Amino acid sequence: MIMLSNGMESRVGTVGAKWEFFHEWKRLTEMDHGNIELPTMLRGICKKENLIDLIENFILFDHSGGTTVKILARNHQYLGVNQAVEMYRHRDVMKGKLGVFWHTQGSGKSYSMVFLAQKIRRKFEGSPTIVVLTDRDELNKQISDTFENCGLLGGLKAKQFIAQSGDDLREKLMGNPSFVFSLIQKFNKADAEPIRPDHDIIVMSDEAHRTQNRIGFTGTPLLRDDNITARTFGQYVSIYDFKRAVEDKATVPLYYENRGEKLQELKNPKINEEIAARLDEEELTPSQQAKLEREFAQEVHLLTAEKRLRVVAHDFVRHYSDVWTSGKAMVVSFNKVTCVRMYNYVQEYWQKEIEEIRKKTEKDASQQEVQELKRKLKWMEETEMAVVVSQEQNEIQTFKKWHLDITPHREKMEKRELDKEFKDADNRLRVVFVCAMWLTGFDVKTLSCLYIDKPMKAHTLMQTIARANRVAEGKTNGLVIDYIGIVKALRQALADYT
């Protein structure tokens, strides 16, 4: 652990960490406004019990990605986790409700869950079982991998701790495992005999559900009418909101640009509140998706028309090739078929842009201009793109109706670890096309440009734009590009969730 200060400003980090990951320690309690001067850091870190606590419970070694990174808790994580620990200490008084842990997306919520689990299992008798709940397979894998890579699973593979079925979950809970990772859907036997363990079970719910001793982790706050979550988990145990995270440089600011309204040839459907809410529904089955598209056939037709998609694809190529040094990009489309169509159109315009740049290098230009064009040309030629969508039954036939072939995309998704490639700053996979996957709980620090061409609102919109707010070396901000017209929904979401 290294502390750096000139007296007026102070930061703390770990040996070998880049400057972007040295952070301020400017609060002694969550209520403090914040003071970046040295005395605050000295009182917060160097006080004997705090220093011992930090060294013992708030340092991790993350072995993901083939390298080992030393992680020191940030100020907000240290304060929030310790408040949650105190709630657990008084769990009988709290009737098992440990509260809602609201730390905004991108501020290290997964690490906070690891810190909390680590400290409780070290400092309290009885070795409580910690059950981590999510509602998607990809999130379940991500959080279990985080626990494994940070060494909390005793050198064992995360797969051994994942409940594969409702029966497997029940069998695991009847034992005394250190950890269980499960989808909430696995609790599917409401009439089964209750399990009565002789030890504590702590349920950490990523976006909140009902259990024994329980704490709900969330990246967005409870809305005023969300009484179920409050009744289940209790009130907030820790708050670290969107604005404070940006002020503390725990996340980078997000800049918004409405490019859709600048494109005169772009014909957008009129999306009212009802349509936006329905189109925004997550994880629809193929039959539900088909029913939805029939119900709003006119709007969907306009949204997915070839002429419109080509306008968006062409503008994406022009824009992203202009900001090519900024980082990686994610394109969010309406559905799986549209993702593949957008991929094809972008490939077409990408190659045309490459040809245009080649022609420019052959024209009269200064040596400096030619060198810059050649650098850009090399980058564009090397850049790889991928479609990332979940698999469904009869998908080959579904795509054939649109004269599309999903097979090469599916093979790429199955044979390669696209998530790891996209997270690797040096990997040539720089653009992904998604509609639902990777929009929540997927942390890519070098993702800087998010292109939205799908109606979204509220919680889903906030989760999505947060993909671009992670801190990375040389990254000053994330950019949200709007083609569909989400500005009203974005204002409402920011009002509700920040």
Question: Regions from the language model: what does each represent?
Answer:
Residues 467-494:
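Conserved segment of the helicase C-terminal RecA-like domain
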Residues 226-328, 342-365:
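Interdomain helical connector at the RecA1-RecA2 junction of SF1/SF2 helicase-like NTPases
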Residues 151-193:
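Inter-Walker segment of RecA-like/P-loop motor cores
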Residues 433-434, 438-455, 461-463, 478-482:
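A short beta-strand element within the Helicase C-terminal
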